[in-house]
């Protein structure tokens, strides 16, 4: 009896010891480790499958196709280099030049006066920076001095009605000021107190309440546009979604219950829970939903909790695909018996779990990492292909690799991994969500992972480090609407300030159709607002990744 108890204690000790070692390794990596999930396969033979003739034939065909891809990409890149304009040391021609001309010496001036030709020789150009400039646009009306007072008043009121509508009392603030604040806080993640310094350096020192007031007015003016983007996103074939935490300052008073208002109901629940624990803030959530390439908008939704109410309310009636993490709240919404949505799971999440466990068992983790790597090789090669062609290669090559992965999951190596170990948990994660992980092979338009939505979360994470908290539920909802405009403009490589100025101006005046202000449509008529260097940078990066992938496959 005592011996059995000792054995149980020994097993428990070994289990706890293993957990401590895993936590210690994770902590060391968090502090000083490389966070890149780069995996170099220690045994390239793992990528060969002589026992599986169908898969080996597909891999051989992929190598031949990769060789052709290398030739195509190399030819295209070399052609682009030849056609590229030679780089010069001169600054852009459209920048204003302030000229400083040094006069001739006295002796040379005499020669010039006698008829010697003089020409100007550029010695050097120096780039200078002038801080942003604020100015006041004053409107005047000429009035006859003898005019009656009532006629003068009528003329002034008529003129005031003709002045372009601004924001605030009597329209005192132009849309350009509101756009500058919105870009500062939601694109560049600058808190209000630092925005004060920026404006003060240009001669105007606004209070933080004034800056916040202008954001209120901005959100009110543009509120219909985020709603339109949301409706468009719900027409997507696939929606990516994710969420992250935001600190919400505890409201002073518990609001009254409103029948059917789930937001208020969740707020009351969270407040009562926080007050019971003695907290002064609430752990709210900012959700992000991203449409596909046919509905290219990124929308944000502020909620006081991670309860399923948020996605359930926003996705009500949606019948497409949903790519999200495997949080139970998401699963309950997508897998609800009344739902017609198709759940997808993220291969980047699956890979990350195995990668984080590889130090505990490098031998067992090598094959699944290599197989997932091959899935991504196919995705990189097919990145710019038509969706029909991408569907075909997924149905052939990707499907065979997934079959090999399934065989490994059901095989002796995976079965022998301790379920409680980190690798065992990663393997079980893939087993649990296998069907959702394989959905992408059915349609070339579907994504293989949720990375593009996770990048949206970085916007909130960086902003959170600067502005620290949200002051109220209303402010959270307001911020979500403005962030929707900023992120969607950024997705289309637009100058966000130029876009917001135009959007705020037209919506405040009611002088444009809402659809014309969607960033993809607006972009087509405003080429001067496109950050072409970002488009070129992304295109070059993707092309280089395809070239490296094709080269590696063709040489393996």
Predicted regions and their residues:
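Mobile genetic element proteins and their domesticated derivatives, centered on retroelements
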Residues: 33, 108-110, 146, 181, ...
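Short, flexible loop/hinge motifs at secondary-structure junctions
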Residues: 1-171, 240-241, 247, 260-279, ...
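Acidic/histidine-rich catalytic cores and adjacent linkers
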Residues: 317-320, 324-331, 370-556
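Gly/Pro-rich turn-and-neighbor structural signature
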Residues: 87-92, 96-112, 193-313, 317, ...
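Structured ligand/cofactor/substrate-binding pocket environments in proteins
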Residues: 172-179, 187-190, 298-336, 476-483
């Amino acid at each position: 009896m005592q011996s059995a108890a000792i054995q149980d204690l020994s097993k428990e000790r070994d289990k706890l010891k293993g957990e401590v070692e895993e936590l210690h390794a994770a902590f060391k990596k968090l502090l000083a480790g490389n966070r890149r999930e780069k995996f170099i396969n220690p045994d390239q033979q793992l990528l060969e499958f002589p026992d599986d003739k169908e898969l080996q034939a597909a891999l051989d065909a992929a190598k031949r196709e990769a060789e052709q891809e290398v030739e195509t990409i190399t030819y295209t890149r070399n052609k682009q280099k030849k056609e590229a304009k030679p780089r010069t040391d001169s600054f852009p021609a459209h920048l204003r030049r302030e000229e400083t001309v040094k006069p001739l010496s006295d002796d040379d001036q005499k020669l010039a006066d006698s008829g010697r030709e003089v020409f100007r020789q550029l010695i050097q150009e120096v780039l200078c920076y002038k801080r942003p400039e604020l100015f006041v646009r004053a409107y005047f009306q000429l009035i006859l001095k003898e005019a009656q007072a009532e006629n003068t008043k009528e003329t002034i009121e008529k003129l005031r009605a003709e002045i372009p509508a601004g924001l605030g009392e009597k329209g005192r603030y132009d849309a350009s000021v509101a756009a500058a604040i919105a870009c500062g806080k939601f694109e560049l993640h600058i808190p209000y107190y630092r925005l004060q310094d920026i404006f003060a350096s240009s001669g105007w020192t606004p209070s933080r309440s004034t800056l916040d007031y202008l954001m209120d007015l901005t959100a009110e003016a543009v509120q219909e546009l985020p709603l339109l983007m949301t409706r468009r996103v719900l027409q997507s074939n696939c929606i990516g979604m994710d969420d992250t935490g935001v600190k919400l300052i505890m409201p002073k008073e518990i609001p009254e219950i409103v029948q059917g208002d789930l937001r208020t109901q969740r707020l009351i629940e969270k407040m009562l829970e926080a007050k019971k624990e003695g907290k002064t803030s609430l752990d709210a959530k900012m959700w992000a939903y991203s449409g596909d390439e046919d509905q290219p908008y990124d929308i944000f939704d502020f909620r006081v909790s991670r309860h399923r109410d948020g996605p359930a309310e926003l996705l009500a009636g949606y019948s497409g695909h949903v790519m999200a993490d495997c949080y139970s709240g998401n699963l309950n919404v997508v897998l609800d018996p009344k739902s017609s949505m198709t759940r997808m799971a993220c291969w980047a999440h699956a890979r990350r779990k195995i990668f984080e466990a590889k130090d505990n068992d490098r031998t067992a983790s090598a094959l699944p990492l290599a197989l997932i790597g091959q899935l991504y090789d196919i995705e990189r090669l097919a990145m710019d292909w038509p969706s029909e062609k991408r569907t075909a290669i997924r149905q052939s090559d990707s499907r065979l690799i997934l079959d090999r992965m399934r065989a490994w999951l059901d095989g002796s190596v995976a079965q022998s991994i301790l379920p409680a170990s980190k690798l065992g948990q990663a393997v079980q994660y893939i087993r649990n969500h296998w069907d959702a992980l394989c959905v992408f092979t059915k349609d070339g338009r579907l994504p293989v992972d949720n990375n593009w939505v996770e990048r949206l979360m970085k916007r909130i994470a960086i902003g959170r480090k600067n502005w620290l908290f949200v002051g109220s539920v209303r402010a959270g909802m307001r911020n979500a609407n403005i962030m929707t405009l900023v992120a969607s403009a950024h997705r289309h490589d637009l100058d966000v300030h130029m876009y917001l100025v135009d959007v705020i101006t037209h919506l405040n005046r009611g002088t444009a159709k809402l659809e014309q202000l969607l960033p993809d449509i607006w972009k087509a008529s405003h080429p001067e607002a496109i950050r072409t260097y970002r488009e070129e940078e992304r295109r070059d990066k993707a092309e280089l990744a395809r070239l490296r992938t094709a080269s590696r496959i063709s040489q393996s």
